[in-house]
Amino acid sequence: MSKFQHDVMLKIVKIIDLVMITIPFALCWELYYSYQVYAKFGWKGNWAMIGLFAVLFFLLGKVYDSFWMSLQRISELIYGQVLAAMATDGILYIVICLMARRLCNLLPGIAAIAGQVVMATLWARCAHSWYFRIFPPQPTAVVYDVRHGLEKLINEYGLSKKYDVKMTLNVEECLNDLSLLDGMQSVFISGVHSHERNIILKYCVGQGINVFVIPRVGDVIMSGAQPMHMFHLPVLRVGRYMASPEFLFVKRAMDIVISLVALVILSPVFLITAIAVKSDGGPAFYKQVRLTEDGKQFEILKFRSMRVDAEKDGVARLSTGDKDDRITKVGHIIRACRLDELPQLLNILKGDLSIVGPRPERPEIAAQYCEEMPEFALRLQAKAGLTGYAQVYGKYNTTPYDKLQMDLMYIAHPSLIEDLKIMLATVKILFMPESTEGVAEGATTAMEQETK
């Protein structure tokens, strides 16, 4: 099957999904909400509302991976579908209330959501099964330099579930006989130095083989290079993170507006959580020194989720998750719902944090990381954030090196659109238990987790 046929088939299946999810909203609008608005809509207006739903669902679906049929778990695909549909329904409910100049009955909307859940489940199960039947895993080779971490890449990270790994080759073995890659549709290159990697890249591109490079830190930094011409030569300019003044101004304005609105809306939750934590014994809030842009220190504010004497021995430790006996009963609940992070909205308002940016580390833990990999300090080029690229696309126990690369990918490409995508995608991970996992029991830092 050609790439063109492959792409056409995928688009058709996605369009079917778009129609299936839109139908419940269309019925809800046509049978009820269209009669509630102040100005009556004609058939063109009705189609405009239905079209608006479809466009918003498509855009949010891209953020929540709602159309990613090759996801390992059907439940994750359904979750993304339902989340995108509910977010779209919520936005259009607000629009309808504004047009009706009053609060409208929620029951028809809830009925539409129920219909969308059924449609999403049906489509996800059929599409997931169809995808792996029509597009079986591609024969794949993995080329590596150091074997450390290779098994994690193939098994834990799910490479073997999406690709048919036929062989794993040491880079020297591969360079001695590049024809070993013949017959492969995909090649993953991990930890290979640029000179050897370029030889393999050229061969694979010439043979029409897809190449996926797992980058090193230097590669991530180079990805943000500015192409230019000097001395009649193509040149790539690489420098320190230097976002434009306009970008920083708009980003700060967004931080202030969003944090203020969130504080007002979530104030009842804020109050209830504070009372619950206080009733557990000890103060409601917990302050801790963290690092932000250029290594500046600030006190991050959280709802206390651990015992007051959690670090009485003076040793800084990362949480080991549900098995951590330092976490209180209330702490388990607020951590699961991410409510312990709510007070950081005050840090954002003050200017210590941004909504999106690399998560701030404790100075002593950051120092341990920097001893092992000095490039870890590069993430201090940008202001720390409440959520970030690594939080959305990694896990709590993703290795420090992988988190660093994710943070540097964000820093290399500053974009307000990317910030908005990360904010929206953060909603998805709030209810995903694997994103709250801690480090292995007995490890004090994630660096130790990597070696366990």
What is the role of each PLM region?
Residues 247-310, 347, 416, 422-452:
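A hydrophobic, helix-centered structural microdomain
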